[in-house]
Design a protein with these regions (language model features):
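Histidine- and acidic-residue-rich, metal-dependent catalytic cores
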Residues: 1-172
């Protein structure tokens, strides 16, 4: 709502957030069985098709244009360097611009085969270094939201739970 979306758009954005990587289901058997091995250039090109595959899946299932375009363009960077269409600035639908910020943040605070998760504070610092990729107005809304006292406490609790689980695993 801080970004000026209607209640209906907020609801649709939550659906797009749940479905934004649905196109990866089409490629899971090929790419995600690799485990710790780095992806080849051809595999990276293939993975970059997931927004287009997600677009096809959601189009066939009659989702709204807002949801479909948010999914299709969620890897577009504000400076035009993203994919699949190299859109820039306001050419990128607002839902996709919001998803881009959230998707990058979620990726940074998650473990990956090639690196450990960053703290949420470090993730924000990394995103600030790459600010050209994001709509500044929306990024400032994002910062306001995640610096809310309740949200900060939830992020800290999630990090602590993760650390506690890791410690339990170490002793087994």
């Amino acid at each position: 709502r801080k970004a000026g979306l209607s209640e209906e758009q907020c609801h649709e954005l939550s659906i797009a957030g749940l479905l934004h990587d649905i196109g990866k289901l089409e490629m899971a058997k090929y790419v995600y069985q690799k485990g710790q091995k780095p992806l080849t250039i051809e595999e990276i090109k293939y993975v970059r098709l997931h927004p287009t595959l997600g677009y096809a899946i959601t189009s066939q299932n009659h989702y709204s244009d807002f949801i479909i375009k948010s999914i299709l363009y969620h890897h577009e960077n504000y400076d035009g360097s993203g994919f699949p269409s190299n859109l820039k600035e306001d050419e990128i639908p607002i839902g996709a611009r919001i998803l881009r910020i959230c998707d990058v943040f979620a990726a940074l605070i998650s473990d990956r085969p090639y690196r450990r998760a960053f703290s949420w504070e470090k993730a924000v610092a990394i995103m600030i270094e790459e600010i050209k990729n994001f709509d500044l107005k929306l990024f400032l809304c994002f910062l306001e939201i995640i610096h809310d006292e309740v949200i900060c406490e939830r992020l800290r609790t999630c990090e602590q739970m993760k650390w506690d689980l890791e410690e339990d695993t170490l002793w087994q």
